[in-house]
């Protein structure tokens, strides 16, 4: 309930006039914040959310009122990828999924699909490394630490340009952490930047 009661915070923002507002949000907090920002006339192209704060569920109901709002992401929206087209053709259209036809291509659907790709790749790597058909949790962890979703493999899977390469290791479970920025155009999310690497030399010592 409290996440939907933001008026006083946005009145403070209107008074102090910051150059940018960054939102680490989730759930009902996101559309409420975007709505309040628009109501107080804060420029939405100066309002950016983290990757929890930039899905279709956060902006669709607001439509053009949310136009300009920014969010980070690590998977691209849309269905213009062979892998997504195959999911639609072989899974969604034949009725083998509870997903509605309009869901593939949206932020959360594509992100969940890529999560499934990572797990499937980890299992495959684990099977190859251990020689087992039925792998254990420890085996899959080994697979995750040796996963290699480089540009060539992403292209082979039908996901060229979909996300940053994912190269697993014990030392780096974040895989570098690169993201890009997407923007709501009033009806859909559009990717507006290339991949942006984190400033680990600045952040990690903190």
Set out the residue ranges of the language-model regions.
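Extracytoplasmic/periplasmic, Sec-exported soluble proteins
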Residues: 2-5, 24-29, 79-82, 104-115, ...
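Extracellular/periplasmic catalytic domains that process cell-envelope and extracellular macromolecules
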Residues: 14-16, 39-41, 61-65, 134, ...
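Segments of small-molecule ligand-sensing domains
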Residues: 96-109, 120-191
């Amino acid at each position: 309930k409290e996440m939907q009661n933001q008026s006083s915070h946005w009145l403070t923002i209107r008074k102090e006039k910051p150059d940018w507002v960054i939102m680490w949000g989730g759930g009902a907090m996101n559309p409420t914040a975007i709505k309040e920002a628009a109501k107080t006339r804060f420029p939405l192209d100066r309002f950016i959310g983290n990757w929890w704060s930039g899905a279709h569920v956060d902006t669709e109901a607001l439509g053009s009122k949310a136009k300009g709002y920014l969010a980070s992401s690590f998977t691209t929206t849309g269905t213009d990828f062979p892998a997504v087209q195959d999911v639609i053709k072989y899974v969604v259209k034949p009725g083998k999924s509870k997903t509605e036809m309009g869901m593939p291509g949206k932020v959360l659907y594509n992100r969940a699909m890529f999560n499934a790709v990572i797990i499937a790749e980890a299992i495959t790597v684990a099977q190859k490394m251990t020689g087992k058909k039925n792998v254990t949790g420890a085996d899959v962890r080994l697979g995750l630490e040796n996963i290699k979703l480089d540009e060539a493999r992403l292209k082979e899977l039908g996901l060229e340009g979909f996300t940053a390469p994912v190269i697993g290791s014990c030392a780096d479970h974040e895989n570098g952490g690169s993201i890009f920025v997407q923007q709501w155009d009033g009806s859909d999310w559009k990717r507006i930047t290339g991949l942006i690497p984190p400033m680990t030399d600045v952040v990690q010592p903190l």
